[in-house]
């Protein structure tokens, strides 16, 4: 379960950076 949380957090961070670049 821990690795799922890590992947989830990494995915959120990546999406946040992508959104910032787009905007």
Swiss-Prot record:
Highest taxon of the lineage: Eukaryota
GO annotation terms (biological process): defense response to bacterium; killing of cells of another organism
Modification Glutamine amide, positions: 23
Disulphide bridges: none
Subcellular location: Secreted
Keywords carried by this UniProt record: Amidation, Amphibian defense peptide, Antibiotic, Antimicrobial, Cytolysis, Hemolysis, Secreted
GO cellular component term, pick one: extracellular region
Tissue-specificity statement: Expressed by the skin glands.
Function: Antimicrobial peptide, active against the Gram-positive bacterium S.aureus, and the Gram-negative bacteria E.coli and P.aeruginosa. Has hemolytic activity (5% hemolysis at 128 ug/ml).
Assigned protein family: Belongs to the frog skin active peptide (FSAP) family. Dermaseptin subfamily.
Protein name stated in the entry: Dermaseptin-4
């Amino acid at each position: 379960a821990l690795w799922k949380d890590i992947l989830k957090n990494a995915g959120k961070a990546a999406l946040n950076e992508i959104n910032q670049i787009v905007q």
